[in-house]
């Protein structure tokens, strides 16, 4: 241990502290930072391979409780013949798929309503060819849910509400009906 030394360091262009854990795949670190930026960094040299900026409007900060944070990415590849993709949620509620080799956007979907205090700060998960993502904003009174999107197309497969909606309207499930009784 006493012979260990710093191999390299990388300065992210953000004044906000980092809350994401990098993911490493084939010698590349993928990490998200504040304001919905994603970086691919060569793990051996520390050289930036690409940088993606979701270009979230600064005015969206007013719709969040806890600052312009982003807590991580997910990576997925169906097989060796398929493209490796990086997925993350943007502060303004989009779920975005990026080509892991080039940093180019493959697709983007608006996962949250644009007229409320919704955001996405959490990292997505990949399950059975679906990207699973939740929403943020519960601290500001929005309704929570978890959604699944097709990894290839971005088409929504399902949405599960975690809290009941308007008590004067039918709920999406028996469990939500029981929660109101």
Regions found by a protein language model. Give the residues of each.
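Repeat-blade elements of multi-bladed beta-propeller folds
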Residues: 17-37, 63-94, 119-143, 180-181
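Beta-propeller blade signature
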Residues: 98, 102-103, 144-156
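Generic hydrophobic/packing signal
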Residues: 33, 42-45, 52-56, 77-79, ...
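Short, acidic, Ser/Thr-enriched surface-loop or helix-capping motifs
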Residues: 1, 24, 42-43, 90, ...
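Aromatic (tryptophan-biased) beta-strands that constitute blades/sheets of beta-rich domains
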Residues: 1-12, 47-62, 104-113, 155-163, ...
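Accessory beta-strand-rich segments of carbohydrate-active enzymes
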Residues: 93-94, 99, 103-106, 132
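Acidic, proline/glycine-rich low-complexity intrinsically disordered segments
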Residues: 1-2, 10-14, 24-28, 34-35, ...
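Surface-exposed, flexible loop/turn segments at secondary-structure boundaries
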Residues: 12, 37, 57, 81, ...
């Amino acid at each position: 241990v006493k012979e260990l030394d710093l191999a390299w360091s990388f300065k992210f262009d953000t004044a906000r502290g980092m809350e994401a854990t990098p993911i490493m795949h084939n010698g590349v670190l993928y990490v998200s930072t504040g304001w919905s930026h994603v970086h691919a960094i060569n793990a051996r040299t520390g050289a930036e391979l690409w940088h993606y900026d979701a270009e979230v409007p600064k005015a969206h900060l007013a719709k969040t409780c806890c600052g312009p944070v982003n807590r991580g990415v997910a990576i997925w590849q169906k097989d060796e013949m398929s493209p490796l993709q990086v997925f993350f949620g943007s502060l303004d509620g989009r779920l975005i798929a990026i080509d892991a080799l080039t940093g180019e956007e493959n697709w983007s979907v608006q996962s949250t309503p644009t007229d409320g205090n919704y955001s996405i700060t959490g990292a997505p998960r990949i399950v059975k060819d679906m990207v699973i993502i939740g929403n943020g904003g519960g601290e500001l009174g929005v309704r929570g849910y978890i959604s699944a999107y097709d990894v290839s197309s971005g088409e929504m497969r399902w949405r599960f509400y975690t809290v009941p909606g308007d008590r004067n309207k039918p709920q999406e499930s028996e469990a939500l009906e029981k929660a109101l009784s």
